[in-house]
């Protein structure tokens, strides 16, 4: 598996299995003397139709609250792993797309993401892991997560 990786990106989802993904990424980073970065993408949801204009501010407030909560969680996790603040990203968008975009922008050569075993290829990998695997321009390690 080791291929002299220089920059590893953890795609964190804060699930109960995030520790497994982070642990695997940290092991690989230590083995390869690689820089470690981490990101969390808050899944964007469409704003309410303009016919329901009063709901738009609620949607924006909810998105802002989710982003703020994500930033706090990511900072705590990244700090515990010794990941520099300039190597942490929390954004709102499409997880599969934005993980790949961040990896490209930061010249990452390995993305580490969790995968859930559920059903079909999407169920085997999970929709985010599936999107990352199929669109990344670098290696992807899908860490198999045990279902509780």
Predicted regions located by residue number:
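General small-molecule cofactor/ligand-binding pocket signal
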Residues: 39, 87-91, 141
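Small/aliphatic-rich secondary-structure junction motif
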Residues: 2-56
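Structural beta-alpha unit
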Residues: 1-4, 76-111, 148
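Glycine-rich, Arg-bearing micro-motifs that act as flexible, cationic patches
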Residues: 110-131
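A short acidic, glycine-rich active-site loop
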Residues: 56-70
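Short, hinge-like loop/turn segments at secondary-structure boundaries
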Residues: 53-57, 105-106, 129-130
């Amino acid at each position: 598996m080791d291929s002299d990786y220089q920059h590893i990106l953890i795609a964190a989802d804060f699930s109960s299995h995030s520790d497994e993904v982070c642990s695997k990424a940290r092991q690989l980073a230590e083995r390869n003397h690689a820089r470690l970065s981490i990101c969390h993408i808050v899944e964007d949801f469409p704003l309410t139709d303009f016919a329901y204009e009063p709901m738009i501010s609620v949607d924006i407030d909810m998105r802002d609250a989710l982003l703020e909560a994500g930033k706090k969680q990511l900072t705590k996790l990244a700090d515990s792993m010794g990941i520099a603040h300039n190597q942490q990203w929390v954004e709102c968008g499409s997880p599969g797309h934005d993980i790949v975009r961040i990896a490209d922008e930061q010249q990452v050569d390995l993305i580490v993401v969790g995968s859930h075993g559920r059903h079909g290829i999407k169920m085997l990998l999970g929709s985010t892991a599936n999107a990352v695997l199929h669109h990344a321009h670098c290696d992807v390690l899908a860490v198999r997560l045990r279902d509780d």
